[in-house]
């Protein structure tokens, strides 16, 4: 089993909070959160570590991610699939997000530092069903040095999100925590409740995409359309055009 690294100390992404309104999807947009659990009441989901409904969050990480997604996409239907940190549980959770929960979006606020063929197969399965896959692009650490490839964000089927800091004017700024990886597609605010990391940027992007799906026709519910949408609302930051810190830009979000 490979070690999974949470990102509660590092980056930011630009997000735009867009309220969910009546749109092309009659049912609420469904977002499955693959994480450490959630300590809030009345949470739907499953514990993939022991097959129970115990969603208690010993890390606190999944609770923060859930809260951020709820703030950014208040009308979305959220499911917590508790699966840390077992690679077998994570893989099954990806498949069930598609087949059991009928997910529109899967949020993965974590990284692996090594490729996994089995997980990639599950990710590809979800992508073929037009499920949007969003993942943290990682934080700089001794185990993930500058420019490291991190997964699942590095796979082309996944939208990788970096977390960035903001200055006093609310503008994105550089940070010593940036991993600087080509896994980054866009960036968003990575600060929440005194913690920092790309873990907290990813759910902001997932929430924005929930709003996008709610307002658009089903033919536009694909990764390519979603990525073009994110690029259209992102504000260029860092070097002109694409760079490995901010990706295609910072997506601004007021939540958090």
Model-derived segments and spans:
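Substrate-binding/access-modulating region of protease and related hydrolase catalytic domains
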Residues: 81-155, 194-204, 238-244
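Positively charged n-region of N-terminal signal peptides that target proteins for export
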Residues: 1-5
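Active-site alpha-helical elements of protease catalytic centers
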Residues: 52-82, 193-215
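C-terminal subdomain of the subtilisin-like protease fold in secreted/lumenal serine endopeptidases
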Residues: 104-108, 160, 214-256
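Active-site core segment of subtilase-fold serine proteases
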Residues: 24-77, 92, 96-103, 167, ...
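Short helix-loop-beta-strand segments that form the rim/entrance of peptidase-like active sites
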Residues: 69-89, 219-234
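Bacterial Sec-dependent signal peptides at the C-terminal "C-region" and cleavage site
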Residues: 15-27
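Extracellular S/T/G-rich loop segment that most often corresponds to the catalytic His/Ser-adjacent loop
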Residues: 27-35, 150-214, 250-253
């Amino acid at each position: 089993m490979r070690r999974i690294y949470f990102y509660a100390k590092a980056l930011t992404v630009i997000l735009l909070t867009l309220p969910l309104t009546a749109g092309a999807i009659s049912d609420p947009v469904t977002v499955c959160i693959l994480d450490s659990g959630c300590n809030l009441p009345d949470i739907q989901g499953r514990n993939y570590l022991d097959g129970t409904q115990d969603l208690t969050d010993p890390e606190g990480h999944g609770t923060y991610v859930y809260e951020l997604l709820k703030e950014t996409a208040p009308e979305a239907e959220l499911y917590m699939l508790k699966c840390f940190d077992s690679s077998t549980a994570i893989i099954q959770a990806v498949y069930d997000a598609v087949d059991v929960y009928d997910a529109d979006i899967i949020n993965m606020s974590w990284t692996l530092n090594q490729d996994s063929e089995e997980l990639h197969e599950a990710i590809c399965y979800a992508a073929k069903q037009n499920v949007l896959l969003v993942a943290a692009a990682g934080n700089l650490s001794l185990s993930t040095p500058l420019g490291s490839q991190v997964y699942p964000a590095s796979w082309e089927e996944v939208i990788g999100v970096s977390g960035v800091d903001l200055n006093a004017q609310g503008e994105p700024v550089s940070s010593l925590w940036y991993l600087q990886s080509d896994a980054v597609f866009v960036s968003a605010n990575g600060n929440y409740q005194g913690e920092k990391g790309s873990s907290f940027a990813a759910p902001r992007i997932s929430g924005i995409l929930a709003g996008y799906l709610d307002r658009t026709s089903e033919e536009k519910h694909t990764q390519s359309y979603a990525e073009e949408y994110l690029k259209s609302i992102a504000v260029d930051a860092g070097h002109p055009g694409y760079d490995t810190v901010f990706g295609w830009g910072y997506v601004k979000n007021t939540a958090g």
